[in-house]
């Protein structure tokens, strides 16, 4: 039952506390009391008033303090707002009253319905009346100006509270919608199935929907940011509605699934990544981590410069790879611990230390060398045989004076050896570039695992990098230091000696590759090409286009040989022999590859033959018919070539296979062979005649479709000075580790199902090629 306002008595007890609420309370707390509770409160209050009526009026407590507290407290304004009265009805000041005499009871009056309606109507027009308007309104309604002032003040507080409640409700609703939508996308990714066979979708196949998922993810992030900004305005601090994913492919689908950077040459960062994919989510919180990163980088730079300049006893000389090779330096762990007690701290349990140093004079200026090292794309291209993926996660400093002096950036890099039997090494580090006081330049890497710990640490970079000294005539002297701690227990036995010696990932391989690539880049810019040699390409534009096409071929080959997860290959289980790894990918809308299903088969094995002899045999077109099944026994001729450096084995060639069958058309093969102190490569791909004519005339090579195949030849370990050893696997054997890899188009329809017959054919092809090579080089190695 509702009680008219005029019959509702005051609800102030003897202690001045309010038992009930005025009509204004219903504005801010409409559901505070239900009907039954209201009746009980009213009956209880009637009993209180019966007792109060027996007390003289002078003993009633004054409400002066309560009025002031209600007026000054916005939260308590709701209770006061419906009460009115004068603060001292007798006109006697508080100081003049007898302290022994109880104060008279304060008389309060409810605002009438008419007064409330008039003030609410005025509030709609003007929520902030001035003194003149309040006085005029109080005169019209028969109220004190102070009563009008407090009513408007409390009314504004109520409206603000209502608005905030509405906004909070809307934010909660939007938040729940986004959360549900985000969960739907996660479930869709986790339960995706192959449209052909109904089985789980292969990692590479997820790229078909990746573009749409990226767009949707960006939209969701914008919506989250908008809502968080609104919430922060009312709550007073930023809100994070959703937890941030922190483990990329560590759980098989852990790298920020939708918002990923793109690797060089258009290869997208893997959606589900591999062991180190989580680095992408370990972005630097600049304000918090930057001072620590800077301090770590400066200390690492100091350590690198000293390690590059000091000799014995810090560095000792190891036996050379052969009689013509330079001596290789290794680090003394005891001296290192004594000279650099700080650094990254003690070696992690289960990790093996690996350190090496090498130097060379290369044909490139210091400025160009620094630019290559500080640009992730150029870095991955120049060292494509060592770096399978390089991503700059965050640039903390771009340097000063228009160069890279002082540049600081956080990177994630995956290092590789060209074999499926050697796991890649993933590292998360800061790269720092500095010009020293003596004019030399230094670029140093040091792991950030101390700031961003990884649950599974398999590769930790202690200060590593290079010191670059400018030389006359555009040359530079480069001193390279590699110092890492690794878990290499997964390396196959035939590669353990190579890896443990530091030849697989060490400084000699970096310096050898850099020297060879500098010569290659110099040949691109060469202008004094002799025209007397037969088959030499003299056109400047033709040379550039052909070398660019060959570079793409080499990068594609290296990306399909190793166990890297950065190139969207899907390994097939149960594909045949255990020593052959078969992978597949779908090629769609890629002008550099033929459309369809591509199979990649790779295997590695040991040969009791020196690496140079294997390299010369495989690159020689006259002996190609002994191992190349696809040439069908035809005669192979070199039509054109481009020399790439001092060693005649470094060149790009265009070969023609003259088929012995008159019904078959002749085939062109693009081949690049390269060699240095750390290893050799022979990589080739069939090419279209019309497309190659365009390239030789300086046309764009990016639209030439090719699938590379070839060989990577590495020594089986450090050899004793001067000889090939006894032919057995071990230190000083002088044998070779040969990796054979084929990329073959098995179906021109990308949506077709992969047949087991195609896999068997590729396995048979690679097995037959391996047997032919073994037979041929073994026959050559026998003394005549």
From Swiss-Prot:
Main location: nucleus
Region (Disordered): 60-113
Taxonomy, superkingdom: Eukaryota
CDD domains referenced in this protein's UniProt entry, alphabetically: homeodomain (cd00086), START_ArGLABRA2_like (cd08875)
Residue ranges of every copy of the START domain listed in the record: 286-523
Segments of skewed composition (Basic residues): 102-113
Chaperone is among the record's keywords: no
Gene Ontology MF terms: DNA binding; DNA-binding transcription factor activity, RNA polymerase II-specific; lipid binding
Pfam families, per the entry: Homeodomain (PF00046), START (PF01852)
Cellular component terms (Gene Ontology): nucleus
Keywords assigned: Coiled coil, DNA-binding, Homeobox, Nucleus, Transcription, Transcription regulation
Coiled-coil boundaries: 158-234
Subcellular location field: Nucleus
Binding region for DNA: 104-163
Family: Belongs to the HD-ZIP homeobox family. Class IV subfamily.
Protein purpose: Probable transcription factor.
Protein name: Homeobox-leucine zipper protein ROC2
Organism: Oryza sativa subsp. japonica
